[in-house]
UniProtKB/Swiss-Prot annotation:
The gene is CXCR5. Residues 1-55, 110-124, 189-219, 281-304 are extracellular. Glycans are attached at N28, N196. Belongs to the G-protein coupled receptor 1 family. The lineage of its organism: Eukaryota, Metazoa, Chordata, Craniata, Vertebrata. Keywords: B-cell activation, Cell membrane, Disulfide bond, G-protein coupled receptor, Glycoprotein, Membrane, Receptor, Transducer, Transmembrane, Transmembrane helix. This is C-X-C chemokine receptor type 5.
Amino acid sequence: MNYPLTLEMDLENLEDLFWELDRLDNYNDTSLVENHLCPATEGPLMASFKAVFVPVAYSLIFLLGVIGNVLVLVILERHRQTRSSTETFLFHLAVADLLLVFILPFAVAEGSVGWVLGTFLCKTVIALHKVNFYCSSLLLACIAVDRYLAIVHAVHAYRHRRLLSIHITCGTIWLVGFLLALPEILFAKVSQGHHNNSLPRCTFSQENQAETHAWFTSRFLYHVAGFLLPMLVMGWCYVGVVHRLRQAQRRPQRQKAVRVAILVTSIFFLCWSPYHIVIFLDTLARLKAVDNTCKLNGSLPVAITMCEFLGLAHCCLNPMLYTFAGVKFRSDLSRLLTKLGCTGPASLCQLFPSWRRSSLSESENATSLTTF
């Protein structure tokens, strides 16, 4: 008796069908791995984490990020005429962080009720997320190059010409960040999951082969242009800077001035490298370059959510770093808070009484807001 399809062909067709559904639904409920169905990837623990911890944590990051980065912008703007090149880059970095924290309320709302704000706002939020991530990494790379040229090669220029080149560089960075994020902006759309209880999501559309290729292109740009190349540039520059500063021990002030840039870069690496590792692993799984086991398929969504939270927390860490590390910045922050009425014994100004002592003793020799 002849059958039109063999059992082996049926299994292969069934596997292809489930793999396609799994790709389109972004690991939502079930997937076929190694010829058997995996259980649901989002258990009660993950559901509780998304429902309780994520809104609270993102709200805290939002508040700290807005307050901290606004204070950084106000202080740096007050010294606009005397800002160094590094501080100009840090000003734009604070702008990028501030814009990035504005997407957090949208992320919390999407996790609770799905995306209900339409395609235009979907593309806008994706643009804010990706553009500002690219700009943050590129600005940190520019800070590293700027310190490398100034310290290792002693490159100096007339102030007005140097500031003009810095502003042109910052404008170029924002343009490059937008161009790198363009694939995600163009293909972002609101899509409904394939399951009855799925919420609408703002995602990268992968409904055809061209969109899938664009998705892999955006992932490649995200890994290489957004993280790997900037980190290589930063590492190369700061190795040269540290080597040079060890030879020039008679300039301790210059050694202190470069520490904040290295610390900012280190915090960026520590916050974003775990996310890039799990996203890269997710990319390999989708390319079938690694065995897509049920364990991996169930662990990736949890790891991505946790590591993304760590990366977004970076938005509120830089202002804290400037406050605890920068002598002159700390002094200016103390004066600003005093003008705002921060004078009582229980005020924020009294939480760290050593601030004023260290600021008075060291700020006279500080020529930069980011000097230690």
